[in-house]
Amino acid sequence: MREKTSAASETGDNEWYTPPDIVLAARAVLGGIDLDPASSPEANAVIGASRIWTAADDGLARPWAGKVWMNPPYAQPACDRFCARLAREYAEGAVTAACVLVNNATETTWFQEVGGQAAAVCFPRGRLRFWQPGKESAAPLQGQAVLYLGPDPVAFRAEFVKFGIVVTRR
């Protein structure tokens, strides 16, 4: 009998925002952020994307282009759909570079799809501490990965090695 594999239990709350130091490193690698397709005004106060799509906007139904930062909703099927969309938009050239923060669920289809296009991946040491407005920061139940899709894995390594192991393609 085959069992379905899944990541560690989720909190059920998709509104956990990226630690600012990770955002600063991603912004440095990308040279700015044109789009965050899974955001909120509160998160964008740190992200600083030129354009955001919120849950109300339905980022999956909107156009994606340029340099993208993405910390997708971790609940399924949203994470799968956002990662598939990023992989497609990057392969087609609409997205020119991207940094995506996800659980390090390397066994999943969505991780394999977007990870298969990544020029580099950072596996942070320890668990990142996500934040919410008005709440204490918290670490998730499993580790994360930051995947880089773009032309400059050397710059990604230089910025992200301070967070943990960085693996690049040859």
Predicted features and spans:
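Class I S-adenosyl-L-methionine-dependent methyltransferase catalytic core
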Residues: 1-170
